[in-house]
Amino acid sequence: MKRVFLIVLDSFGIGSSPDADKFNDVGSNTFGHIVEKCFLGEANVGRKGVLCIPNLVKLGIINAAKESTGQYPLGFNYSSNVIASYGFASEISSGKDTTSGHWEIAGVPVLDDWYYFKEKQNSFPESLLEKIIRRSELTGFIGNCHASGTDIISRLGEEHIQTKKPIVYTSSDSVFQIACHEEFFGLSNLYKLCKTVRFILDQYNYKVARVIARPFIGNDKLQFQRTGNRRDFSIKPFATTVIKKLIDEKQGQVIAIGKVSDIYGGIGISKNIKSTGLYELCSTTIHEMKKALNNTIVFTNLVDFDSNWGHRRDVSGYAKGLELFDSRLSEIISLVQKNDLLILTADHGCDPTWIGTDHTRENVPVLIYSPGIKKNFLGHRKTFADIGQTIAKYFLLTDMSYGQNML
């Protein structure tokens, strides 16, 4: 029986990539800086002390981080009891966004640029907004700027409730984000609006990676908070991903947990399981691992690292999240059978100590555990697509166009 358990720790970078200078991210190091802040006692909100992640250490994260940056994370040394193969990978996609990272992991790097809304104010062209307003029968929008999602609902949420005008905003990523109140605007209305925006963007050749529904609740700016009902309406992959190949060539199953299905536009997904919160995502993953059949990929994205702690520059929260995940990792490891592969990686960085609120261009860990495979150092992988190619070889699929087998 062959099964792959692929877990993406969203934004868990381990040091700036060779091309980080093009993104003003030289020196960024999501993992390393979290470890440093914990060691120095500067990440003690809701937790305390040095970062405690024994299971990630056992899978080789410390050694991988050292190979990525040239030095061990503060307070750690070489781990001799590693049970997995470990390495690190750099991205060849042109962006440092979720879609690019995940598609490249699945063997389809995004080499051309996405369309970005670069203006900080009046970010979306009036002609585009007018098309959306006409088709959606809205009275208008508010926002139309670069913004943090939590900040903009605090600032404009009350006006949105009063006027029923959706809040639209973007970031340095290729995204069109829409925030609406679940009760006063309606969740189904928000999803319908996002589908309309996705259709119009595609119709008029705006190569925008994602339209994101950002629902929130609360009665005033002191109470507004985003809910777990976020949805991403992604552009469809340009080529066949390894998850689609598994279904097409082996009639296999791809179980998508969290926002994975949204990232691939539902393409190459057999079963989509919506799950929110780090603990619940881990529980759902464990549940699906226990019943996974032959030729199955269980594919989980742990979004909280990025959305709750990376973008919000919350070092303590990120550290606490890593420790929570590590506490669930022992059970995950115990479920991996002789011919299975457990792969832990990330899609980009989001250093919570870095300037601004955006992603950081970083190398990502590649940790592969299987009781049936001899452990070794995987080296510096030149593309995330090596993960997709490795999965293709493992399932005896036709070759992917990018990447090399690591095993």
Curated annotation (Swiss-Prot):
Binding site for Mn(2+) 2: 306, 311, 359
One of the Pfam families matching this protein, by short name: Metalloenzyme
GO MF annotation terms: magnesium ion binding; manganese ion binding; phosphopentomutase activity
DNA-binding as UniProt keyword: no
Binding residues annotated for Mn(2+) 1, in chain numbering: 10, 347-348
EC top class named in words: isomerase
InterPro entries noted in UniProt: Alkaline_phosphatase_core_sf, DeoB, Metalloenzyme, Phosphopentomutase_DeoB_cap_sf
Catalytic activity: 2-deoxy-alpha-D-ribose 1-phosphate = 2-deoxy-D-ribose 5-phosphate; alpha-D-ribose 1-phosphate = D-ribose 5-phosphate
GO biological process: 2-deoxyribose 1-phosphate catabolic process; 5-phosphoribose 1-diphosphate biosynthetic process; metabolic compound salvage; nucleotide metabolic process
Highest taxon listed in the record's lineage: Bacteria
Keyword Manganese: yes
Cofactor binding, per record: Binds 2 manganese ions.
Keywords recorded for this protein, A-Z: Cytoplasm, Isomerase, Manganese, Metal-binding
Pathway(s) this gene product operates in, as recorded in its UniProt entry: Carbohydrate degradation; 2-deoxy-D-ribose 1-phosphate degradation; D-glyceraldehyde 3-phosphate and acetaldehyde from 2-deoxy-alpha-D-ribose 1-phosphate: step 1/2
Compartments (UniProt record): Cytoplasm
EC number: 5.4.2.7
Main location: cytoplasm
Gene3D superfamilies: Alkaline Phosphatase, subunit A, Phosphopentomutase
Example of a GO cellular component annotation carried by this entry: cytosol
Cofactor: Mn(2+)
UniProt-listed NCBIfam families: deoB, PRK05362.1
Family: Belongs to the phosphopentomutase family.
UniProt function note: Isomerase that catalyzes the conversion of deoxy-ribose 1-phosphate (dRib-1-P) and ribose 1-phosphate (Rib-1-P) to deoxy-ribose 5-phosphate (dRib-5-P) and ribose 5-phosphate (Rib-5-P), respectively.
Protein name (database record): Phosphopentomutase
Source organism (scientific name): Buchnera aphidicola subsp. Acyrthosiphon pisum (strain 5A)
